[in-house]
Amino acid sequence: MAWNLAIITLVGKDGTKLEATLRRENRGLMCLGNGWKDLSISNGLKSGKSFTLELILENGTPMLSLVSTQSTSHKSQKRECSKHSEKESISAVPSKGKKNRKARSNREERRDSSSAIQNRFVTFTPEDIRDCILILPSQFIKANGINNLGEITLLGQNRMKWFAYLLSMSKDGSLALGSGWKGICEANGVNTGEAFTLEYIDEQETAHGRAQVCFYGVFPGKSVRSFASLRSKWNDLFYDFLREQNLRVNPIIGVAICLCKHHYCNYNSCSLFKPRPKLSQKNLNS
C-alpha cells in the first residue's frame, strides 16, 4: 500500500524538467510514481540499465537530477514498461523486507558455523557464585553433553590441573562446581569481583577407571607454586597451610576451606571454614 505525499521535479541530462509524484509506502520506503517513465524515455534509458539520481536544491526547492547511466545485464530486468503495468512506481532503495530477510539469513549462517565454538565457552560473574560454589548454566551443560556428576579436572593457563566436584543444583539441569574452582582462580590471577571464562575441552582422560571432563581457563596465568602442595593428600605441607590460615582441620571439606577465605566467600557467613586461634600438634595428628 502506498499514498502520494508530494510532487517532485526530475531533471534530465539536458536540463529538461519533468514532474513526478513522490510516494511513501507503509514500510517507510520513498518511491517515484507517475512521471519517472517519461524521464527514462526522454533520456534513452532502457530496461536492464541502471541510472543514478542526485538530490539537488534549486532556490531551496529539492529536485532529483539524472547524473549518469550505467549498462547492466541483469536477466531479471528484461521486462518493458507498458500501460497495463500494475505498478507505476520504482523504489529508490531495495525492499526493507528483503534486506531484513537477507541479514537474518546471514546471521543464522554465521551462528550455525560458530555455534560449536561458542558453546565451548562460559563466562562467570560474581552473581554465579552461591554459598561458595560456582553455578554452571544448563545451556552450557547440555551443549557439551556433560552428564556425569563427580570429579572433573580444571586446567589452568599453564596446563596445571585442579580437581573439582560436579554437583547437581536444580531440576532445570544446572550443575555447580564445588571445591577446587577457587584454587584455579587464585592461581591464575582472578581477583574478587572479576569475571572469568572457562572453555570446555573435548578431551577425555582416564583416571580411577572413569572419564573426566577438562576445562581450560582463558585468563592470564601466574605462579601456582604456593598452591601446588594443596593438591596432595593430607600431609605436613597441607597442615602448615591450615596453620597459617588459622583454620580448623576438616577432612570432609579439604582444600576448599583454605581457598575459600582468600577472595570468593564472605568470611563471616561461609560455612566451609571456621577460624580458630591456633592448631595444636595434637589436633594436627588426629
UniProtKB/Swiss-Prot annotation:
Give start-end positions of Basic and acidic residues composition bias. 78-89
For this protein, the record's Gene3D superfamilies field holds: DNA-binding pseudobarrel domain
Compartments annotated for it: namely: Nucleus
The terms describing its cellular component in GO are: nucleus
Region of interest called Disordered, as start-end residue ranges on this chain = 68-114
Instruction: Give the highest taxon in the source lineage.
Output: Eukaryota
Q: Which CDD domains match?
A: B3_DNA (cd10017)
Per its UniProt record, what InterPro entries does this chain match? B3_DNA-bd (IPR003340), DNA-bd_pseudobarrel_sf (IPR015300), REM_fam (IPR039218)
The record's DNA-binding region positions are: 1-70, 119-219
Spell out the molecular function terms from Gene Ontology.
DNA binding
Among SUPFAM superfamilies, the record links this protein to: DNA-binding pseudobarrel domain
> Short name of one Pfam family for this protein?
B3
What keywords appear on the UniProt entry?
A: DNA-binding, Nucleus, Repeat, Transcription, Transcription regulation
* Major site of localization recorded for this protein: nucleus
Under what name is this protein listed?
B3 domain-containing protein REM11
Q: State the species of origin.
A: Arabidopsis thaliana (Mouse-ear cress)
